[in-house]
Amino acid sequence: MAKKIEAYIKLQVAAGQANPSPPVGPALGQRGVNIMEFCKAFNAKTQGMEPGLPIPTVITVYSDRSFTFITKTPPAPVLLKKAAGIKSGSGRPNTDKVGTVTRAQLEEIAKTKEPDLTAADMEAAVRTIAGTARSMGLNVEGL
């Protein structure tokens, strides 16, 4: 018989840097999950990724206090900021442009994000990422 699901917990945790401090500790502690067990498993799974990159994670907590978790790809704005070499997006994206990204950079980000995007093909995925870039105040070259 399948285990009864008690809760889903959605967190963004830095790759390879999960520790019992907030936000991880309180979110898991409320549900009675072994926090250190999650931290060790998460850090082991994200070992090959760039340290500090925020990773969206969905943790499924079962009634017997066990858990499973799924890691997703880093958020597109984080990848775009890294590609453009900027700290943050524009406060007024239509008037103040803060950087530029090329089509090659957009394709690279779209390939990284492909498992989490609902785009029909790679061209649609690139256009989706380009829209995110424009909404952050980045110029898009090559589209």
Curated annotation (Swiss-Prot):
Which Pfam family name is an example for this entry?
A: Ribosomal_L11_N
One GO cellular component assignment for this chain's record is: cytosolic large ribosomal subunit
PTM text: One or more lysine residues are methylated.
Its Gene Ontology molecular function terms? Answer: large ribosomal subunit rRNA binding; structural constituent of ribosome
Q: Which UniProt keywords apply?
A: Methylation, Ribonucleoprotein, Ribosomal protein, RNA-binding, rRNA-binding
The Gene Ontology biological process terms listed for this entry are: translation
Q: How does it assemble?
A: Part of the ribosomal stalk of the 50S ribosomal subunit. Interacts with L10 and the large rRNA to form the base of the stalk. L10 forms an elongated spine to which L12 dimers bind in a sequential fashion forming a multimeric L10(L12)X complex.
Q: Which PANTHER family match?
A: 60S RIBOSOMAL PROTEIN L12, LARGE RIBOSOMAL SUBUNIT PROTEIN UL11M
Q: What does this protein do?
A: Forms part of the ribosomal stalk which helps the ribosome interact with GTP-bound translation factors.
Q: Which family does it belong to?
A: Belongs to the universal ribosomal protein uL11 family.
- Name of this chain's protein: Large ribosomal subunit protein uL11
